[in-house]
Amino acid sequence: PSYDPNHTPATGESVDFCPSLWGGKDWPPAAYNPDTGLVYIPANDNHCGVIEGREVTYMPGSSYTGARTEFTLREPEGNIGEIQAWNMDSGEKVWSVEFESHNWGGILTTAGNLIFSGGTSDRFFRAHDASTGEELWRFRTNSGIIGVPSTYSVNGKQYVAIQSGWGVDAAGMTARIDQQRGTRTFVPQGGVVWVFALPD
């Protein structure tokens, strides 16, 4: 392959950037509601990264980036995670709901003008008004949620299901936030599928 040396990190030089590699819009899926015209995005904006180019020796099975990375909070006491609602026609943010921790939860939106999401270290699965973002309901699960909500109906009754179980990036980044803030967050492990019936 060919490389442009102007875009190759220089050894010994560092760059700061916000949000970090785990920020902005990460892997948890967003959802679009054609009735509201809004797209709902799980986002993590209030943290930054520092990358410094360095000489490294390749070791099979380990990270090999040629860089040292650090993690910092943009505002140490502020929120990190959000649900953002954006108007697809105007490109404007309509509302956001902020969380103290990262938001690793995929989003489900329904024809009943609701959105469902988990993803925060407090272990809550939440329902919000899709037009305003107002929290309408919450349920604390046994563990954190990094799964994606789904919905289905049986004999005309609508259900929403979610899998709880904390780990991977969510657990690692929670530990890094704790290190920055001088806190200790405990999120129990263990996977469970939760199913909730929507009211008639």
Task: Report residues per predicted region.
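Beta-sheet-rich non-transmembrane sensory/scaffold domains
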Residues: 1-200
